[in-house]
């Protein structure tokens, strides 16, 4: 039972008793019949009558309050449906290849969406299921050595002299396995995950993507050197095809980037070396080196970088997977139906979103479309059959209230209603309802025995993988915030646009309010980062647009983000700046651009990203 019912009941009863005194004074004759003479009522039957009335009005008040989230949910269902769903647990894993199994010389591809099963805990019955976000190609190679140095001339000699701006460098030695020379590999791109403790991987990420001025591939004995353009070194994880959360076409994808960042910042710590094939054809041995020179030197990285911090064959993964829920038996006496993934283990699964709803009876299958989806009679026919979804925080059982839940994350429950075009109950002769949904394992990722076994996960598909190791996470799942007072704050961002960001004195406040919607309010470190955004300013500018074809100039916005670096101890400010750079580029329309500048009070201008054309359509 909702605990607010008792609160409303006491309020209504107090109001009746207080107003009874005024009523008795104004109308003593009528009040005398009801035995009302003041705050107390002498007649016990009238007292019971007043208490019953207070109970009924309290229930009416609850029903009125229930219409408030219904309105906000309906609005968010149209514009940003991902706000209504919980944020699943996320992780970063390495798929370590088995050199003794399969032919890896031509590469073995593991596509995006591969299923990973976690190990069972001592009291668990259900294994957590994760799905990968990046495609991974396995090769017979390893990172044998890596070192960061601050004097390129002393380490690299003439190679460093070819780049006078170089003040530091990173050397990565790759070694092939099973006696296979590099020129027999068709490898062209090599993604690496930056692994490590505390702030170190974030500092290395800033050096690689913010300060790289030259990239070389060479033989260890310097017998040959191949220079690559700096554009061959790029970030991974920001594109829609690398997304962890579902990509909703009608929603702005910049919000998804923020949601993933605040759930697990390490999911963006990926860099990729591309265009390697030409250099590899020159390497007839089993070792080669990737050398990156930097225009700035970070002294804290010198002597601390090793091969364990540059990990190949990695991918982010999310505890989100498709599953058919148990059939629902329909009844005319019930308007809403509880969606249960598995009745034998109801607490081990949570519905993230519904993908397909269909009714089953004596006749043909009846498909139901989302009520707020685009309606196309030519495609779905003229049968007005829709479903509407409602999500509520899970109510603890009496046993859980006595002994406590198994974790602090309780999760939510999903209810579906069958309606017609007017949201009236759908009249039917169906007997069962079949539902396909995206599901999570609720709070089970919190109990996974990470590091207790040789492999933290098992790859469901057959592949030459001997170990799946968890490198970051699993992160804590988060409940939807559309049920509390932040629902209106979610709706308020509908009015946020690049003009509000450009408004002097208002841009920082608008972005901080936006970040509070995604950051965990119970995490002091994240809240400190949000407050670390001190100022946002913008000015119009004209730049040459970076696009193929003839030279084209365009008008856009130079947006400067000013941060307090002391608020980002442990993670650094560069990664959040990179997320914002992609966010702002997606925010502006085509035929315009943004040029994002990252500044801190401690270091001044940290990074000026290249002008990036907008990707938002005008219509």
From Swiss-Prot:
The protein here is known as Type VI secretion system component TssF1
Quaternary structure and partners: Interacts with TssA1.
- The residues forming the signal peptide are none
What task does this protein carry out? Core component of the H1 type VI (H1-T6SS) secretion system that plays a role in the release of toxins targeting both eukaryotic and prokaryotic species.
Q: Which NCBIfam families match?
A: VI_chp_6
Spell out the InterPro entries in the cross-references. T6SS_TssF
